[in-house]
């Protein structure tokens, strides 16, 4: 017997009928205006159900996520987020490049890295080298342009109310990550350290210390999990790029948010709707529960 929970961004009868057909005794529960939970004992294997959900996602243009009973029912006490194009709407290095007038060159390398076509460490060094001589004042300009992803503040607030420890682990840079940490009331921020000239006025085009790549993100999640005395099922990771997949695999629930196709196929779950707050539905937190959590300002 295999028990599972399927969470889908739809309440359309034809979609729910397809999902219900995967269960022996599926129970349906509305989570809100747009999300539905169907849970119970599957007729076939978990892998078959996941494949069916991927087909439903593609043919019905919905987010259909099949989660194991253990994954769905375990409270998430540690959540690690990617930053660029996940918590915020920018890719910070692209914004720095725009200030330097080299956005096309840097964006091309960024795209190759996020699609897993070139090594992230190599791509980061190549991109940062193009920023040599850029004034450090530009960093504050970029921070001033940061816009948060819809639902990011609400998701983080609700998770904090639920007692979770929140971490941003970014392949971007420390000043931006610290700003995001402060704005979203996160507990920890990890990112790459840009090297400055001796007078502190310009970027040298180099990164100091170990690069925060996919492996380092996974290590951060693992280290924090061990510090907190948690098991894998009590953790969650959210990201959009290929370099987030190792971190997602290290977590109990990996969520690909508006991610590249390869990432969506390999992650535990996916969200393609514009708001990050939708991640709460994958935890079984319905609309009314979310409203109560958001009303609590403590």
Swiss-Prot record:
One of its GO terms (cellular component) is cytoplasm. Keywords: Amino-acid biosynthesis, Hydrolase, Magnesium, Metal-binding, Serine biosynthesis. It catalyses: O-phospho-L-serine + H2O = L-serine + phosphate; O-phospho-D-serine + H2O = D-serine + phosphate. Its EC number is 3.1.3.3. The active site is at 82 (nucleophile), 84 (proton donor). Substrate binds at residues 91, 127, 170-171, 217, 243. Binds 1 Mg(2+) ion per subunit. Mg(2+) binds at residues 82, 84, 240. Pathway: Amino-acid biosynthesis; L-serine biosynthesis; L-serine from 3-phospho-D-glycerate: step 3/3. Its cofactor is Mg(2+). GO terms for biological process: L-serine biosynthetic process; L-serine metabolic process. It comes from the Eukaryota. Pfam families: Hydrolase. InterPro entries: HAD-like_SerB, HAD-like_sf, HAD_sf, PSP. SUPFAM superfamilies: HAD-like (SSF56784). Transmembrane segments: none annotated. This is Probable phosphoserine phosphatase. It comes from Schizosaccharomyces pombe (strain 972 / ATCC 24843) (Fission yeast).
